[in-house]
UniProtKB/Swiss-Prot annotation:
<dbReference type="InterPro" id="IPR005324">
    <property type="entry name" value="Ribosomal_uS5_C"/>
</dbReference>
<dbReference type="Pfam" id="PF03719">
    <property type="entry name" value="Ribosomal_S5_C"/>
</dbReference>
<comment type="function">
    <text>With S4 and S12 plays an important role in translational accuracy.</text>
</comment>
<dbReference type="InterPro" id="IPR018192">
    <property type="entry name" value="Ribosomal_uS5_N_CS"/>
</dbReference>
<comment type="function">
    <text>Located at the back of the 30S subunit body where it stabilizes the conformation of the head with respect to the body.</text>
</comment>
<keyword id="KW-0699">rRNA-binding</keyword>
<keyword id="KW-0689">Ribosomal protein</keyword>
<dbReference type="GO" id="GO:0015935">
    <property type="term" value="C:small ribosomal subunit"/>
</dbReference>
<dbReference type="GO" id="GO:0006412">
    <property type="term" value="P:translation"/>
</dbReference>
<comment type="subunit">
    <text>Part of the 30S ribosomal subunit. Contacts proteins S4 and S8.</text>
</comment>
<dbReference type="InterPro" id="IPR013810">
    <property type="entry name" value="Ribosomal_uS5_N"/>
</dbReference>
<dbReference type="Pfam" id="PF00333">
    <property type="entry name" value="Ribosomal_S5"/>
</dbReference>
<feature type="domain" description="S5 DRBM">
    <location>
        <begin position="18"/>
        <end position="81"/>
    </location>
</feature>
<dbReference type="GO" id="GO:0003735">
    <property type="term" value="F:structural constituent of ribosome"/>
</dbReference>
<dbReference type="InterPro" id="IPR020568">
    <property type="entry name" value="Ribosomal_Su5_D2-typ_SF"/>
</dbReference>
<dbReference type="InterPro" id="IPR000851">
    <property type="entry name" value="Ribosomal_uS5"/>
</dbReference>
<dbReference type="InterPro" id="IPR005712">
    <property type="entry name" value="Ribosomal_uS5_bac-type"/>
</dbReference>
Length: 176
């Protein structure tokens, strides 16, 4: 029996648990004897708005194929972001190449105050209050990798205590 793609057209695609956001599509060209050949690169972010987010860059001769490749890569590169009360647990600087991104926690009601790339990633990770500043190069790909570097290095107070071997002190009701 041969496989025919035309038979699959009416089958519903499975719904993903992740929301997706395409940050940008880049077109490159190579000149050959007969003319130019174009290729496309797509940067896609996937997230469940509940602490899980992934990023992928797909390259292909056509835009839809590049986007599908990017989604597939993003699913494989998922990370967990510790979200406490809608914000990140502490201030951190993410670095990639010459791009640095400062990520700061913010109080309730602040919202996500950030550039396009950090805002998209934070919102798909489920962060509702955060401050961000892009330092150095503002290349979208490098900024995205820098944000992911920052998110990967975030630790909750509980994780830090476990790493240091410290037990949590009981909270007493005030100064004595």
């Amino acid at each position: 029996m041969t496989f025919n793609r035309r038979n699959d057209r009416n089958v519903e695609r499975e719904t993903s648990e992740f929301e997706e956001k395409m940050l940008f599509v880049n077109r490159t060209s190579k000149t050959y004897q007969g003319g130019r050949r174009f290729r496309f690169a797509a940067l896609v972010i996937l997230g469940d708005r509940n602490g899980r987010v992934g990023m992928g860059i797909g390259k292909a001769k056509e835009v839809p194929v590049a986007i599908e490749k990017a989604k597939s890569i993003a699913r494989k590169n998922m990370i967990s972001v510790p979200v406490e009360n809608g914000t990140i647990p502490h201030e951190i600087v993410g670095v990639n190449s010459t791009s640095r991104v400062l990520l700061k926690p913010a109080g309730p009601g602040t919202g996500v105050i950030a550039g396009t790339v950090p805002r998209s990633i934070a919102e798909l990770a489920g962060i509702t209050n955060m401050l961000s500043k892009e330092l150095g190069s503002r290349n979208k790909v490098n900024v995205a990798y820098a944000v992911f570097d920052g998110f990967k290095n975030l630790r909750t107070a509980k994780q830090v205590r476990a790493l240091r071997g410290i037990e949590a002190a009981p909270v007493t009701g005030g100064a004595q």
